Amino acid sequence: MKNKLPPFIEIYRALIATPSISATEEALDQSNADLITLLADWFKDLGFNVEVQPVPGTRNKFNMLASTGQGAGGLLLAGHTDTVPFDDGRWTRDPFTLTEHDGKLYGLGTADMKGFFAFILDALRDVDVTKLAKPLYILATADEETSMAGARYFAETTALRPDCAIIGEPTSLQPVRAHKGHISNAIRIQGQSGHSSDPARGVNAIELMHDAIGHILQLRDNLKERYHYEAFTVPYPTLNLGHIHGGDASNRICACCELHMDIRPLPGMTLNELNGLLNDALAPVSERWPGRLTVDELHPPIPGYECPPNHQLVEVVEKLLGAKTEVVNYCTEAPFIQTLCPTLVLGPGSINQAHQPDEYLETRFIKPTRELITQVIHHFCWH
């Protein structure tokens, strides 16, 4: 029953108080099961059907899909349940205690992005879900901050095809219709060690990597010349060399060298296309030194994303907000949800607060966010 639902600020407080950290380091990684249980119970109280989906390949993590209404199409509101780890030495407040001060709600996940579910639940108090003409879906995903495994798995397995979706990442209520992707790779070169006094008796992996880097930088220039998307502040795919390590002593021929790099592809560029370009760039080194160069993913790749600018979702949201859609350089789960239906990224709070100590959401977002959620539900599910 709706009268069982706690007040907005108590929902928010309970979400923040329930840890759900995602981390590649196992010691820091946490299950989101308790948070999913909280959300599932609240949506059941509102009359939703709730499905909890274990996410394979994770450490006891789950997605939740709450649904109400009949028929095809409808609206999907989505967000992730996990947060990044916190640096205890840099926080001046308890990350798991919601505190309000000077027009700001502080806590880990207030902006990125547990708070979005509090806004959805609060808005639904005034919605009679039995009268919806089209279905309404609420998706809560796992592991966005690391592998995006939850959104990937949901998109791969669901039969849902809503009319449109909104992901409530912190965009300061500015609608986002496109962003770049992210690919991170490790280039490893295996040489042959030996004493530095006789270089011919070894294969210096650093020297081979020097050759490989030259070809990678040429690829970087080619990407900048061949691909362009004017709406982005950096209107071409970027390629960054972020980390390199090789060798263990000045008098030893380096036996192994490893380079970590990332590429930020534009929307429309496929992951297969980029992998092919990288392999082509490194082919001269591989052909000269067979079996010594390998390329491995550091993290699962994320494609670029774009919602068609003329889609009804864009037109409706721009009209409701009085603001044009934007494009951004950071990544979200949108590429995976976009495979199901046209998707916008739109939510309260600033992206500048994401992953920061003393994370907060300004209280000025409370009223307009609640109104926006109510309006999009009425537009896409009542008509």
Swiss-Prot record:
One of the Pfam families matching this protein, by short name: M20_dimer
Primary location recorded for the protein, binned into one broad class: cytoplasm
Gene Ontology cellular component terms for the protein in this record: cytoplasm
Binding locations of Zn(2+) 2: 112, 145, 355
This protein's pathway: Amino-acid biosynthesis; L-arginine biosynthesis; L-ornithine from N(2)-acetyl-L-ornithine (linear): step 1/1
Active-site residues, Swiss-Prot/TrEMBL: 82, 144
GO terms (BP aspect): L-arginine biosynthetic process
A GO molecular-function annotation: zinc ion binding
Coiled-coil stretches: none
Binding site for Zn(2+) 1: 80, 112, 169
This protein's name: Acetylornithine deacetylase
Annotated organism of origin: Escherichia coli O7:K1 (strain IAI39 / ExPEC)
